[in-house]
């Protein structure tokens, strides 16, 4: 159990069956079958679409992987110490310090830049997927600019040119919900902030689930490395929304076609595709606040509470497992049923 006021680390191993861990385990065979089916089709035609869309790290670089491991840093839930006066956004210096501490603890590096070097190479093209759907009205519940900025700055400090760094979202109002380039919250010169609008995709169609064709957006496919930044929220369709769904339904051209049956197994299959898995490098969860009910939109402020955490992982399933348990613990304390 995480204790407020201290810096803590939690590790989860892949055998757990809670939440998204069990979800992906249950659908892993289907994901493999999907990939094998595409490979068989490619062999029959002499083409290799998966190989063409799969990327590899720069020569000689091996990004750090720690399956099942999640590191959380917390400084408690004192709003005065953590948050700006509106209690919606973290204090910039607090967000920066907590992120660096989480990165250092996760990697064992001596500072935040050295930690980022474990995941990003100067020759990478970097896409940073943020989440702002809950912040489109009043900037209330989105990945905070105060956390996005130090991530971008660390990537630049590694040596990646700014023109090779893109912060992206699905829609313009989702992107503005993060306050990127809003009200003076500027990204470093040359770094792009873009939205794809479910239309900007350059790859061929792929069929991932039940023959439904889709494309991943160009900001993801043109990158060699993806940093995934999301939140801790419940979701009225799929139960929990965090890192996995941020990439899947936030990076394809037809997310509306992949929500049936509570988006199960679509989330797992879309995420487990080599297009995604070959690019994932780092997952950061903005846990300064969370929504435990009536999500994913921030429609009821009474369902949004201070949580005071920053999480780092290379395993989106492990982190979503942790996030789901965090929400279930809150719901149990409030006499509500589990998300499961």
Which residue ranges define each predicted feature?
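N-terminal and secondary-structure boundary signal
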Residues: 2-340
């Amino acid at each position: 159990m995480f204790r407020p006021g201290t810096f803590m680390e939690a590790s989860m191993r892949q055998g757990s069956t809670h939440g998204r861990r069990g979800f992906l385990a249950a659908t892993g065979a289907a994901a493999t079958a999907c990939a094998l089916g595409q490979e068989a089709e490619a062999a029959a035609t002499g083409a290799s679409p998966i190989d063409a869309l799969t990327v590899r790290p720069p020569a000689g670089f091996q990004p750090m992987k720690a399956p099942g491991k999640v590191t959380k840093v917390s400084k408690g839930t004192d709003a005065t110490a953590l948050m700006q006066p509106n209690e919606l956004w973290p204090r910039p210096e607090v967000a920066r310090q907590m992120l660096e501490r989480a990165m250092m603890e996760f990697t064992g590096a001596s500072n935040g830049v050295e930690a980022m070097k474990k995941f990003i190479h100067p020759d990478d093209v970097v896409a940073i997927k943020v989440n702002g759907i809950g912040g489109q009205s009043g900037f209330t519940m989105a990945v905070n600019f105060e956390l996005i900025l130090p991530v971008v700055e660390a990537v630049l400090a590694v040596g990646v040119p700014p023109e090779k760094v893109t912060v992206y979202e699905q829609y313009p109002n989702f992107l503005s919900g993060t306050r990127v380039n809003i009200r003076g919250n500027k990204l470093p010169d040359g770094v792009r902030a873009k939205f794809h609008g479910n239309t900007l995709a350059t790859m061929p169609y792929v069929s991932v689930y039940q023959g439904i064709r889709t494309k991943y957006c160009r900001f993801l496919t043109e990158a060699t490395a993806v940093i995934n930044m999301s939140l801790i929220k419940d979701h009225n369709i799929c139960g929990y929304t965090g890192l996995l769904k941020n990439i899947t339904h936030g990076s394809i051209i037809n997310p509306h076609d992949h929500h049936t049956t509570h988006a199960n197994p679509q989330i797992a299959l879309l995420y487990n595709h080599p297009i995604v898995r070959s690019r994932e490098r780092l997952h950061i969860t903005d846990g300064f606040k969370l929504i435990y009910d009536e999500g994913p939109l921030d429609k009821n402020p009474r369902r949004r509470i201070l949580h005071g955490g920053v999480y780092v992982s290379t395993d989106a399933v492990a982190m979503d497992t942790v996030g789901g348990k965090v929400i279930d613990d809150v719901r149990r304390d409030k006499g509500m049923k589990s998300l499961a």
